[in-house]
Amino acid sequence: MYNAAGRREESLACHLAVRNQLLKNGYREGSILLMVDNNMSVVYLDLGRPEEAIPYLTEALELAKENGLVGPAVAEPTWNLARVYRALGDEEKEDIYLKAAVEGFRECYPPEHPKRIAAEQRLKERQGE
């Protein structure tokens, strides 16, 4: 909510507070921590600090794997990693995550979903179409 309103530092502070409380309570199951990590990465991207998003997105994907989560739980952080590596100018890593994100979005979102459209369009751009 704060991030959408342009209040990114407040958004980051709230996400960090929730994340710290979850970890303090020993919570590493399910999708809540994964969602917090993924959402924090979006804030870092919006702040122009993509490198700071990498550890949170890596953890989000690890949590998905540890907990047998699929669909958006994997596709969303994968898409955001593609966005991070695009922002960092690492085309090789962007391509790896972009292809995986498109596959994931095709499995869990309808063709008209905005993120699926954006990912497919970016993949076409990367492939020179």
Protein language model features and the residues they cover:
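Extended non-membrane alpha-helical scaffolds
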Residues: 4-15, 24-25
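Conserved alpha-helical positions within TPR/SEL1-like repeat arrays
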Residues: 3-4, 31-46, 72-83, 114-125
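TPR/TPR-like (Sel1-like) alpha-helical repeat modules
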Residues: 92-110
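Short coil/turn linkers that connect adjacent helices within long alpha-helical scaffolds
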Residues: 24-28, 66-70, 107-111
